[in-house]
Amino acid sequence: MLNQKLNPTPSEDLTIDVDLLYETDPCELKLDEMIEAEPEPEMIEGLPASDALTPADRYLELFEHVQSTKLFPDSKTFPDCAPKMDPLDILIRYRKVRRHRDFDLRRFVENHFWLPETLSSEYVSNPENSLKEHIDQLWPILTREPQDHIPWSSLLALPQSYIVPGGRFSETYYWDSYFTMLGLAESGREDLLKCMADNFAWMIENYGHIPNGNRTYYLSRSQPPVFALMVELFEEDGVRGARRYLDHLKMEYAFWMDGAESLALNQAYRHVVRMPDGSLLNRYWDDRDTPRDESWLEDVETAKHSGRPPNEVYRDLRAGAASGWDYSSRWLRDAGRLASIRTTQFIPIDLNAFLYKLESAIANISALKGERDTEALFRQKASDRRAAVNHYLWDDENGCYRDYDWRREEMALFSAASIVPLYVGMANHEQADRLANVVRSRLLTPGGIMATEYETGEQWDKPNGWAPLQWMAIQGFKRYGDDMLGDEIAHNWLKTVNHFYQEHHKLIEKYHISGGTPREGGGGEYPLQDGFGWTNGVVRRLIGLYGEP
C-alpha cells in the first residue's frame, strides 16, 4: 500500500503531470479489463418510462440549444421548467421554426414553458428575531405541500409535505434532509418529521432507493445513505417506531450492494468494489454517463479539458454529485483542476461508515423483531466492513482515516469525512483519540472545522465550513469522550453562524471559516444559497444543546 503524505503541498502529491497522455496511465488501462464488470445500466426502475424521462431525454436538441447558449444564468433553471403542452408537440414546433431568421429562443421557451419560481424570494426576515426565532419561523417558508404532478414536469410528486433547502433548490434532497430533521425535532415539528419519514419510505418502495432529490434527473443516483440515521432519529423522538422501516432499510441496502456476489477480485459494479483480499467496500456511482441536466454546460466544458473520454468524465462528475461533496479535492487527481475528477476510483471513508451504520441498524432492528438469522448475517457484514475499512482506509502512520484509490492501490486525501466513523460508532477509542489530534492541527479553526486543508476553489475544500460536518464532528468526538473538542467545535460554529446572522439576518449554505471574520463561503458551480435547510437544522439542534450564542 502506498501512502501519501498527510499534508502534501500542491507542488508535490496533489498535482499530476498533465502532459502524461491518458492512454499511458497504467491505472486507466485497467478500464479495458473492467468493461464486463461495469456494463451499461438498464432502464431506471420504479417509474413508467414516460415519467422517468429527464428534460434532456425529452427535449433533445432543444434542451442542448437552451443550455449551450446560456439562455438562463443558472443551468438548473430550464430542467426545472414545466411544459405548457405535450413535450413532443413542443419539440415538433421547435424543429419547424428554429431556422427561421426571426426565431427568438427566449420567446419560444417563455411561450411553451412555465419558469420555476424563486423560492422564498418574497420572505424578509425580522431583524429583531433571535437566531432561534428566525429558524423556527423559516420552517413554514421552506415547507412544500404535496401537489398533483404537473404533466411531464421533472419534479417528482411526493405523498406528504417536505422541506426544501432554499434558494435554487426547490425540491427535497436526501442527505440534506437528515440534518434538517435534527432541527425540526428540536423545534417540536413532529408533524413534518412524520411526513418526511413517509416520503422517504415511499421513495424506497417506488424507486428501489432514495434518489439524490425528487427530480427525474436525480433518479439515476442516490446520496450518502443516511436513512438508517433518520430511522434512529424517528425512534429517539417518538415519531415512528424503527421496526416499521426494516424492509425499507433492507431495500436500500440491496440497492447499494447490487451485483456484489458476482464480482471477482479487483472488480467493480455500480456502487460495489471487491478488494484484492476479497472484502467488499463501496464507492459513489451514477447509472448515467451523460452531462447532468442541471449542470449541462458546466459538465460539457469540464469534459473538454480532461483528455479523457467524455462519458467517463460525466460519470465521475455525476458520482461526485452523489457523494454530496460536489466538488472537492477528495475526487481530483490534480487538486486545482475539476477535469481531473476520478470519483468512481475512490473508496470514500464516509460512504462506508454510513453503510456500516445501515448494516448495524438492520441487525439491531432484526434483533428487536426476533429475526435472529438476519441479525447474525448483518452483524457479520458490519464486522467485515469495519475490518476492511481498518485495512484499507485507516492511516496508522498519521492517525486518521483517508479515502482509498482502489485503482492505484494507494491512500488518498485526508478530509473532514474522516469523522463519520466516529459519528456512527465504527472507530475504536485509540483511533478516535488519534483522529482528534489530527483534526485539531489540520482542520479546526476559530469558526469550526473546514472540509479539507486544501484550497482549490471547489466549495467542499478550504476555507469552507459546512453544517453537517460540524454536527458529525461534535457528536462524534463527544461519543468517544472528547467533550472538550466537541464543545469547542460547537461553540466556534455557533459563533460563526450567529455573527453572520447579526449582520445579514439570514443563514446560508456554507461559511468561509479560515481566518479572520466569518463570511460567505465561495467556490462551486452556482452562487451561494441562503435559507438554508441543513444549516437551520444543525444550528437549531445546537441551540437546544448549548443555548443561544
Curated annotation (Swiss-Prot):
TM segment ranges: none
Primary enzyme class: hydrolase
E.C. no: 3.2.1.28
Pfam families: Trehalase (PF01204)
Top-level lineage group: Bacteria
Gene Ontology BP, a term: trehalose catabolic process
Positions with a binding annotation for substrate: R168, W175, D176, N212, R221, S222, Q223, R292, D293, E294, G324, E525
Chief location: cytoplasm
Active site residues of this protein: D326 (proton donor/acceptor), E509 (proton donor/acceptor)
Gene Ontology terms: cellular component: cytoplasm
Catalytic reactions on record: alpha,alpha-trehalose + H2O = alpha-D-glucose + beta-D-glucose
Record PROSITE patterns: TREHALASE_1, TREHALASE_2
The protein's annotated pathway: Glycan degradation; trehalose degradation; D-glucose from alpha,alpha-trehalose: step 1/1
Alphabetic keyword roster: Cytoplasm, Glycosidase, Hydrolase
GO molecular-function terms, A-Z: alpha,alpha-trehalase activity
Location in or out of the cell: Cytoplasm
PANTHER family linked: CYTOPLASMIC TREHALASE, TREHALASE
Biological role: Hydrolyzes trehalose to glucose. Could be involved, in cells returning to low osmolarity conditions, in the utilization of the accumulated cytoplasmic trehalose, which was synthesized in response to high osmolarity.
Subunit structure: Monomer.
Family as reported in the entry's similarity comment: Belongs to the glycosyl hydrolase 37 family.
Protein name: Cytoplasmic trehalase
Source organism (scientific name): Salmonella typhimurium (strain LT2 / SGSC1412 / ATCC 700720)
Organism taxonomic ancestry: Bacteria, Pseudomonadati, Pseudomonadota, Gammaproteobacteria, Enterobacterales
Gene name in the database record: treF
